[in-house]
Amino acid sequence: MAMLGFYVTFIFFLVCLFTYFFLQKKPQGQPILKNWPFLRMLPGMLHQIPRIYDWTVEVLEATNLTFYFKGPWLSGTDMLFTADPRNIHHILSSNFGNYPKGPEFKKIFDVLGEGILTVDFELWEEMRKSNHALFHNQDFIELSVSSNKSKLKEGLVPFLDNAAQKNIIIELQDVFQRFMFDTSSILMTGYDPMSLSIEMLEVEFGEAADIGEEAIYYRHFKPVILWRLQNWIGIGLERKMRTALATVNRMFAKIISSRRKEEISRAKTEPYSKDALTYYMNVDTSKYKLLKPNKDKFIRDVIFSLVLAGRDTTSSVLTWFFWLLSKHPQVMAKLRHEINTKFDNEDLEKLVYLHAALSESMRLYPPLPFNHKSPAKPDVLPSGHKVDANSKIVICIYALGRMRSVWGEDALDFKPERWISDNGGLRHEPSYKFMAFNSGPRTCLGKNLALLQMKMVALEIIRNYDFKVIEGHKVEPIPSILLRMKHGLKVTVTKKI
């Protein structure tokens, strides 16, 4: 069986690689894929993978915002790509009940288990309600704010001061990932891994998460039998995925075991810890009957999903945000003027231009570039496209933010002013048009905490430091389910006087 799997994998990629190199001669500027016999559109898609995000912009502009991708015969990889706000509103809101994540999503994202990002129906409803109660708990909110403040003071500021003093090159994406990993770990587990330090020690979880996200991305374009064979045999990205998953499981097993021991020894009169791990270990099962606080696997799935979301999305936003500021000094100047004239330590809401600039950054560079859905029953989308039950629909969030038919002829321009109304307040855009925090009933519950955290970090850096991207540094996204920079963001930092 192992040998058969090897030959299936080898032959499949031999054909695809041959076609790929043949297509190297194909001129750019032709976004629509050719439909080949048997392999259909896959060879052309493989050719586009290094620039998949920009390709989706081109193909959706050329096809009136919706495009049907045909994968190899009998492979189960056909997908409908859309950036049509009408379709998005229909799928995520008005006909939400017919569009669960679906069984294919659970297969592809199997490493997340039964976390809130993968479950559907009654279990999702209970997890959503329990998460809502957690994210609106005042103690939890206070823990979020205090952990951000302490990590800024004891982690980010000393690191940036040291880099400025020694005039060394730092990798800002890595810095933000470490900061967010530390703060999300404190908030979700009560444990501070202290990954952000002057020494910048190796972080096993970070590397494991990055590998997992890349492997999950490529699963979307492979038949399930193929990537499962690769995983079983242990080759390619799937081999790395197995190792990464073992690292994650080992880390969370240790944290959960330690906390259970603490809970046993904790006197009944002592207060609970404020973090998510303790909350879910003591969740009220008379209220949330489908939750399993006594099962370590359930706790692992829930907390892993929350830590991953907290680390990856916010760090992605900040990385692209500061890169955009480096390209648009006039925006940086306006931000500093606003901070100097309107800011007080008690009210970040007064910084309207900062909020607008972050929103504009997320429009162009959303942390999650795609959303995957599957209809439970056949349906007809507002665009007129018919979709079968259990078919794959990919909402192209990255492309949505760049559609001229949605955002105007200046859609590719970085203009925070588009988010400011005539009276100087923030302009609201519907979530099916601006999907940085998802849309409909699955809208991100941590939106307000994430925005607060981003503003706190941005404020600290903008007010106290100048930074410069090193000359010749290439900025491009890596193909992944998360919008990360392939080469990071290498900068030098100086402290403002």
From Swiss-Prot:
According to its record, what are the GO cellular component terms?
endoplasmic reticulum; endoplasmic reticulum membrane
What superkingdom does the record give?
Eukaryota
Keyword annotations of the record: Endoplasmic reticulum, Heme, Iron, Membrane, Metal-binding, Monooxygenase, Oxidoreductase, Transmembrane, Transmembrane helix
| EC numbers, comma separated | 1.14.-.-
* Any single GO BP term: wax biosynthetic process
Disruption phenotype annotation: No visible phenotype under normal growth conditions, but stem wax of mutant plants are devoid of secondary alcohols and ketones and have increased alkane amounts.
Q: Which cofactor names does the annotation list? A: heme
Signal sequence range: none
Q: Which GO terms describe its molecular function?
A: heme binding; iron ion binding; midchain alkane hydroxylase activity
Q: In the UniProt record, does the keyword Cytoplasm occur?
A: no
For this chain, the annotated S-S bridges are none
- Please state which protein family the record places this protein in: Belongs to the cytochrome P450 family.
What is the name attached to this protein's record?
A: Alkane hydroxylase MAH1
Q: What is the lineage of its organism?
A: Eukaryota, Viridiplantae, Streptophyta, Embryophyta, Tracheophyta
